[in-house]
Amino acid sequence: MSAAAVERPNEDRPLIAEANRIMDRLPGYRVEIIGGQIIVSPPPDGPHAEALTDLMLPFAASGLHGTESKVLQGVGLWLPTGTEDYAIPDLVVVDADYRDHYVENNCYDPICFRLVLEVTSSNYRTDLRDKVKAYAAAKIPVYVIIDRKHQRLHVLTSPTGDDYESHRPHSPGEVVTLPKSIGAEVTLDVAEILKAGQPQNG
């Protein structure tokens, strides 16, 4: 049983109010609250966006963006790790009725998330450490990380406490099939994804 979502005024949410002020001052930046800390990420570069588009295609082709589930970018995920914690993953697979699970501040209850995916940027440590704990605590079944710095694709499954029981890094040359629990069979070519996301120099 879940209570109806109640929109709280920002005066009662000082961190959220500050995060929203930062977003107003820095259009295009991603602002999240993880572990009670405000995390500010610069706008993604072109290769980051290219990798994300290349990732969208196999998810959509598998039928995941349909009547049972949706494949979305930039959707807020309400986190249980703090009273104002939320994240904005790069890509998510959610139940089709995700709108019924709205919490507040453009964020949704983690119960409707089947998968979250992050393509790393300059603050890659957040994706590889802080968000592992946060997404595990939220019981997100599958967390995929495209680690552009170290040229790896990580698949984390079976959340327990603030960690995942299974954490498998994959290298270029491998082809990875994601767990069918997300609702369909999705296969990713590690080399192709990492090549598309290769950071620009300079």
Predicted regions and their residues:
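Gly/Pro/Ser/Thr-rich low-complexity, intrinsically disordered segments predominantly at protein N-termini
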Residues: 1-138, 142-202
